[in-house]
């Protein structure tokens, strides 16, 4: 298994698919990385040379991925909550942020039903 950005990426998958195992890299970004480094997207990770893996590491290193990206996202959410804006309040209360109805739906965001106590 090749190790890129602190993640073991699977050997038996094509390069484009294997790169998506890294948090912050989806299909489109993985294709752009392969294009920029000159690595064939349909080549398996185990068939890559060490030089090609190094190119991939360098290309992935230019983007915020894994821990840095997770920290950035959580800091953005925390900032919204500290500001006290509408989105921050919705985050704090665990409700949907983008205008969805909450009277009947939104079970995923609100969690399981709690019985009404008398």
UniProtKB/Swiss-Prot annotation:
One of its GO terms (biological process) is translation. GO terms for molecular function: rRNA binding; structural constituent of ribosome; tRNA binding. Keywords: Ribonucleoprotein, Ribosomal protein, RNA-binding, rRNA-binding, tRNA-binding. It comes from the Bacteria. Residues 94-118 are annotated as: Disordered. InterPro entries: Rbsml_uS13_C, Ribosomal_uS13, Ribosomal_uS13-like_H2TH, Ribosomal_uS13_bac-type, Ribosomal_uS13_CS. The keyword Flavoprotein does not apply. It holds the Pfam family Ribosomal_S13. One of its GO terms (cellular component) is small ribosomal subunit. SUPFAM superfamilies: S13-like H2TH domain (SSF46946). Belongs to the universal ribosomal protein uS13 family. Located at the top of the head of the 30S subunit, it contacts several helices of the 16S rRNA. In the 70S ribosome it contacts the 23S rRNA (bridge B1a) and protein L5 of the 50S subunit (bridge B1b), connecting the 2 subunits; these bridges are implicated in subunit movement. Contacts the tRNAs in the A and P-sites. Part of the 30S ribosomal subunit. Forms a loose heterodimer with protein S19. Forms two bridges to the 50S subunit in the 70S ribosome. This is Small ribosomal subunit protein uS13. It comes from Thioalkalivibrio sulfidiphilus (strain HL-EbGR7).
């Amino acid at each position: 298994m090749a190790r890129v950005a602190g993640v073991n990426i699977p050997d038996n998958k094509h390069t484009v698919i294997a790169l998506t195992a890294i948090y912050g890299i989806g299909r489109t970004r993985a294709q752009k990385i392969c294009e920029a480094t000159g690595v064939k997207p349909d080549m398996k990770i185990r068939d890559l040379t060490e030089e090609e893996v190094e190119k991939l590491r360098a290309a992935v290193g230019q983007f915020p991925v894994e821990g840095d990206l997770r920290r950035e996202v959580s800091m953005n959410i925390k900032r919204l909550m500290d500001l006290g804006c509408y989105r921050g309040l919705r985050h704090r209360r665990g409700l949907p942020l983008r205008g969805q109805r909450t009277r009947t739906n939104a079970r995923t965001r609100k969690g399981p039903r709690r019985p009404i106590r008398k």
